[in-house]
Swiss-Prot record:
GO molecular function: quercetin-3-sulfate 4'-sulfotransferase activity
EC number: 2.8.2.27
Residues given in the record as 3'-phosphoadenylyl sulfate binding sites: 69-74, 151, 159, 217, 285-287
Job of this protein: Sulfotransferase that utilizes 3'-phospho-5'-adenylyl sulfate (PAPS) as sulfonate donor to catalyze the sulfate conjugation of quercetin 3-sulfate > kaempferol 3-sulfate > isorhamnetin 3-sulfate > patuletin 3-sulfate, but not tamarixetin 3-sulfate. O-sulfation of position 4' of flavonol. May play a role in auxin transport.
SUPFAM superfamilies: P-loop containing nucleoside triphosphate hydrolases
Activity regulation, short description: No requirement for divalent cations and insensitive to p-chloromercuribenzoate, iodoacetate, or iodoacetamide.
pH dependence: Optimum pH is 7.5.
Catalyses which reaction(s): quercetin 3-sulfate + 3'-phosphoadenylyl sulfate = quercetin 3,4'-bissulfate + adenosine 3',5'-bisphosphate + H(+)
Active site: 129
Protein name: Flavonol 4'-sulfotransferase
Compartments reported by the entry: Cytoplasm
Enzyme class: transferase
Main localization, broad class: cytoplasm
Length: 320
């Protein structure tokens, strides 16, 4: 479904009337708008509206869902390697020459590519950062499978801070972390508030565990083999005994490792299209747990711990 210039202009006018916040932490270079209870860039909201209006899911579709900077790139790489392993191995995979975001498109960003894949009977999972309550109705109506990856909120905040600073070309001295923390703490962040995003999918997973798999980033890092097997089985591509014996799982883990992907030429020097041109290297910063300790003051730690306890204490979900 093509979107006309008039439709885009109409959406742009509507978005301008929404509640908005100009990010002080990024020196006013980014403005977020609030639509259906989440904050997003103008193109995020345009993409969400178009997906809601025109995306038609199929019963066997699989969606990789996440809040930004929570392990999305890694999850995409793993899922893509799993579903294409009959065609490609660690020496021929398109992941060697494409950033994972080009292999698995976002429904709110690459709708045209997704429709082309559907028309060509090309199956790959799709991805989204959209909150659960904003998803196109067909995804929920057809009980499409979803995999949600989440991460320690403190590391998410630090990763988000650096990503925003880098894409807006702000040096460290001009982008105080304290301001970024404060905005995030008050729920003002892309696709946020973070806890609403997380809890939307979590509560849905409790109601429909057969269609929503929750993966904790730190757990996948600690035990990649078991979690890659869980992922493959859940999305309908389980490993055979022969594959396990031949080391296919280990090959996929190695192919998709941070060490491997971050050192590929495409991910060191390539660029991705978006609201702002984004260097692929920015998707591969550190991938380390606990980097937040280098940024958080004791007061910040206490504030965020108290906030998360208030938001999650009765849910059974653990972030630490």
């Amino acid at each position: 479904m093509e979107t006309t210039k008039t439709q885009f202009e109409s959406m742009a006018e509507m978005i301008k009337k929404l509640p908005q916040h100009t990010c002080s932490s990024l020196k006013g270079r980014i403005t977020l708008y609030k639509y259906q209870d989440f904050w997003g860039l103008q193109n995020n909201i345009e993409g969400a509206i178009l997906a809601q209006q025109s995306f038609k899911a199929r019963p066997d579709d699989v969606f990789l869902c996440s809040y930004p900077k929570s392990g999305t790139t890694w999850l995409k790489a793993l899922a893509y390697a799993i579903v294409t392993r009959e065609k490609f191995d660690e020496f021929t995979s398109p992941l060697l020459t494409n950033i994972p975001h080009n292999c698995i498109p976002y429904i709110e960003k690459d709708l045209k590519k997704i429709v082309e894949n559907q028309n060509n009977s090309c199956f790959t999972p799709m991805a989204t950062h959209m909150p659960y309550h904003v998803l196109p109705k067909s995804i929920l109506a057809l009980n499409c499978k979803m995999v949600y990856i989440y991460r320690n909120i403190k590391d998410v905040i630090v990763s988000f801070y650096h990503f925003g600073r880098e894409i807006t070309k702000l040096p460290l001295e001009d982008a105080p972390f304290e301001e970024a923390f404060d905005e995030f703490y008050h729920g003002i962040s892309q696709f946020g508030p973070y806890w609403d995003h997380l809890l939307g999918y979590w509560k849905a997973s409790l109601e429909r565990p057969e269609v929503i798999l929750f993966l904790k980033y730190e757990d996948v890092k600690k035990d990649p083999t078991s979690n890659v097997k869980r992922l493959a089985e859940f999305i309908g591509y389980p490993f055979t005994f022969e594959e396990e014996k031949e080391g296919v799982i280990e090959s996929i883990i190695k192919l998709c490792s941070f060490e491997n992907l971050s050192n590929l030429e495409v991910n060191k020097s390539g660029n991705s299209k978006g609201f702002l041109p984004i260097e692929n290297r920015l998707y591969f910063r550190k991938a380390k747990d606990g980097d937040w300790k280098n940024y958080f003051t004791d007061e910040m730690t206490e504030k965020i711990d108290k906030l998360i306890d208030e938001k999650l204490s009765a849910t059974g979900l653990v972030l630490k």
